[in-house]
Amino acid sequence: MNEYMNEYMKETNEALLHTYNQFPVVLDHGEGAYLYDTEGKKYLDFAAGYAVSSLGYGNQELNEALKAQIDKLFHTSNLYYNTVCGKAAEDLKRITGMDRIFFTNSGGEAVKGTLKAARKYAYKKGTGRYEFIAMKESFHGRSFGALSVTGHDPYRAPFEPLVPGVSFAEYNDLDSVKALVTDKTCAIILEPLQGEGGINLATEEFMKGIRKLCDEEGILMICDEVQCGMGRTGSMFTWQSYGIRPDIMSMAKAIGSGIPVGAFAMTEEIAKYSLEPGDHGTTYGGNPLACTAVSKTIEIFEKKNLVAHVQELGAYLTEKLEELKSECDCVKAVKGKGLMQGIQVTKPLSEITKEALKEGLLIIGAGNDVIRFVPPLIIEKEHVDEMIRILKKVL
């Protein structure tokens, strides 16, 4: 480790609030599926900035579009129309099948917006409903609103009491959800594929059961696609693979390929009775730079047919992880779908991720015992082979 790297880490540690357990590496630039540190060491990235960098690094088409927009206009406010926001919203409508879009700056903000939209719908309908049912081991963000529907006690405990009116059901257990329904239940919120909770994929029975329950009881269904959306699991959004449609959804991360942007979307029926002028807002959301990133990302996705690519590479990744499981006693299960997969292990996650870093592989944990694989969606089979080779050595 060179003097510059040590000095930069020292400077950073003395200036920033210590909210992250950072690895001892200073990243400098990236190309394709690889990142490089300040010493020139190359890392195969199977973390993608927590499933954000879907197009990898150094995509010239995206970069040129962003540079051009920076030279033109990158912020005004939502008091005025701009030439980019409307197109980005139409693009998201098209790929989600939803009717109304609200742009945010992050996934946590998007989730907060879905909760407010659901509460306002109930208020305007005069139902008196205000309660939410969320899932145990879920993760929806760290703001008070998003944290209130996050079902992981260590994240919640230091900040309680949080927003009242939230109860937690067992994931993939429809009876557990039904037992919590009251005449005050406003919405049920869930991730179709839990990321932080340990790469837990919803069953078809569970997703369709939730949709049916919501329809029968007059409850709204909210799908959080912040991590599992935007092609990550082999469909543009994971809920689409179940043949259902939520009333409201959140998205972020990969929709901007690394530019901070999120959004929540809803059907026209919900929008008619939901947020109005004065109910919700954002200073930066929907700015021209972020919206350029959204539209260009979608354009590249469709041009490269990345959803089909993820289906192919996801199947290959599953095959190779199953082979790894058969060879390594410490691997107990292969989980997930598409390019959002994981292996359940008996070794400490911190030990595995640190050793992988030394070998030039970036991976992250999920839950207490799962190694998560969320690489850029542009990877090829040789990248999977390289990852498996390194991981096998580490394990």
What are these language model-derived features?
Residues 2-395:
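Conserved N-terminal phosphate-binding loop of PLP-dependent enzymes in the Aspartate aminotransferase
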